Design a protein with these regions (language model features):
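Signature of the first transmembrane helix
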Residues: 14-75, 79, 243-263
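Hydrophobic transmembrane alpha-helices of multi-pass small-molecule transporters
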Residues: 62-65, 109, 177-181, 207-211, ...
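Short alpha-helical transmembrane segments in multi-pass integral membrane proteins
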Residues: 1-20, 78-143, 187-243, 299-366, ...
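Helix-terminus/linker motif at the lipid-water interface of multi-pass membrane proteins
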Residues: 32-51, 120-127, 183-190, 250-279, ...
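Transmembrane helical elements of multi-pass membrane transporters/channels
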Residues: 18-34, 139, 150, 173, ...
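Short runs within selected transmembrane alpha-helices of multi-pass transporters and secretion channels
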Residues: 71, 139-158, 166-174, 195-210, ...
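Small-residue-rich hydrophobic transmembrane alpha-helices
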Residues: 50-110, 147-166, 273-337, 370-392
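Interfacial/gating helices of multi-pass transporter permease domains
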Residues: 41-61, 127-132, 192-193, 234-241, ...
Length: 457
């Protein structure tokens, strides 16, 4: 039987570290097959094909980010009820979230498929890569239900304190995706569409296996027919928490789309460099994302247990781990960025290699800002203040839009390199005072509840 784990007692640092490691390994796997995906496309299909995949990166983030944000939000009430040991309501939340996911994912898939071509036109996608970008994006949109369910099931399992099981399913998906990539591109000759098909199929199969495993192995999820019914009250709570988290990703992605659109106008070489650099950057920053996800579960459980003081201990522990890792990646990327770029393009592509190196050098200097962003935002979301956390996404969006409109036309690719760091700083300027406000409210709420309890007693 698979086991759940409470994070409401014991030293914060080892608890968070132990929970983060499987998440990190999973995210590294996810980014590894994203790297391999792009490397196979770049090496075997050429620079134009690589640019085709990269031209739609921010659009994919817009849609899938919304889905993933909703999934993370749906897991928060599960974590809170698990922390409060209200297992019946927890099971009802799980059942309702699955039904919501089914309806939402189908609607999103239909709308995005219809609008796919128009989206690429709006983004000023170069004509020489338009056909490949359209094929890749269309297949990705068709596979939205697979992605939605895979991420939701992983979120539910993590909410129960188990970050290991999602890792094993992600490992399966990563290995399968790489094998299918090679088969679809080299054997079947399906081009960039084959890369997207490989990803969608591997996620879909992993989602099915994850669902079967979850209900067979987690006895705590075995509920009654009443608990499996759709309950509108619980659905409203899930949407109230999940949709703002999804919108936060989407709002952030709007700024990324503006930035990528400005970069697309600089030509195919800049698009290819941006694609390579983003794949490498995402590989290294997934540690910050993993720490953030761990803090969402940690803070959610401790909020449910009425222990806000442990949330502050978790912030300090995760910040320490974040700074150590940020220093390590800074040294690694300052020395090795040019070698990582060679994964995607040949040494003869001098301009692309130099631009990729420049992008990574600029980004790694600001990684502590991103680490702080992830820790604070996920913590605020974990205690249920998802609407407040969403405004940090607005700050990111505004920063990227300003860079896209004013800086990129004036300074070119170097301005693109500073787009994300400026967004991280803008978000932190909002999140630091926001967290202070939330933490004070939680402490006051716990104090008030304890006074009421003493009065009743």
């Amino acid at each position: 039987m698979a086991t759940s784990k409470e994070m409401t007692a014991g030293p914060a640092l080892p608890l968070i570290l132990k929970f983060t490691l499987p998440l990190l390994l999973g995210n590294l796997l996810q980014q590894t097959y994203s790297l391999v995906d792009a490397a196979i496309v770049g090496k075997f299909l050429g620079i134009n094909a690589l640019a085709s995949v990269g031209a739609s990166t921010s659009v994919v983030f817009l849609i899938l980010g919304f889905c993933n944000g909703c999934c993370g939000g749906f897991g928060i009430p599960v974590a809170q009820k698990f922390g409060a040991r209200d297992y019946s309501t927890m099971r009802s939340y799980v059942a309702v979230s699955l039904k919501l996911a089914a309806g939402m994912s189908v609607v999103i898939a239909l709308l995005t498929c219809i609008l796919c071509e128009d989206i690429l036109r709006i983004m000023r996608t170069p004509e020489n890569i338009f056909e490949g970008a359209y094929a890749y994006l269309l297949v990705t949109f068709i596979g939205v239900p697979c992605t939605f369910f895979y991420n939701l099931l992983s979120s539910i399992i993590r909410a129960l304190g188990d970050s290991k099981t999602p890792f094993w399913f992600l490992l399966f998906a990563a290995v399968l995706n790489i094998i299918l990539d090679l088969f679809c591109i080299l054997v079947l000759g399906w081009g960039v569409a084959g890369a997207a098909i490989a990803t969608v199929f591997s996620q879909g199969l992993s989602a099915v296996l994850c669902y079967i495993y979850m209900y067979r192995k987690f006895e705590i999820l075995q509920g009654t027919p009443k608990e499996r019914r759709f309950q509108s009250k619980l659905a409203k709570t899930l949407l109230y928490i999940g949709v703002p988290m999804g919108l936060q990703f989407s709002i952030t992605a709007i700024g990324s789309i503006m930035l990528q659109s400005a970069n697309n106008a600089l030509g195919t070489a800049c698009v290819a460099a941006f694609t390579s650099a983003m794949r490498i950057k995402m590989f290294f920053i997934c540690t910050f994302e993993s720490l953030g996800i761990a803090m969402a579960t940690y803070s959610g459980q401790n909020y449910g247990a009425g222990k806000p003081e442990r949330i502050w201990l978790g912030i300090k522990a995760s910040a320490l781990m974040m700074m150590i890792y940020a220093a390590f990646t800074f040294l690694l990327l300052m020395v090795g960025a040019k070698y990582f770029a060679l994964i995607f393009v040949d040494p003869s592509e001098t301009e692309i290699l130099l631009d990729t190196e420049l992008f990574l050098h600029v980004s790694c200097m600001f990684f502590p800002m991103l680490g702080l962003l992830c820790i604070l935002r996920y913590t605020i979301q974990g205690v249920g203040f998802t609407n407040l956390a969403m405004f940090s996404g607005v700050a990111e969006m505004i920063a990227r839009i300003l860079v896209s409109i004013y800086a990129v036309p004036a300074f070119g690719f170097i301005a693109v390199c500073y787009g994300d760091p400026m967004a991280w700083i803008a978000a932190d300027l909002f999140l630091v005072p926001a967290f202070i406000y939330v933490y004070r409210r939680l402490k006051k709420q716990v104090f008030t509840n304890s006074q009421v309890t003493q009065t009743v007693a």
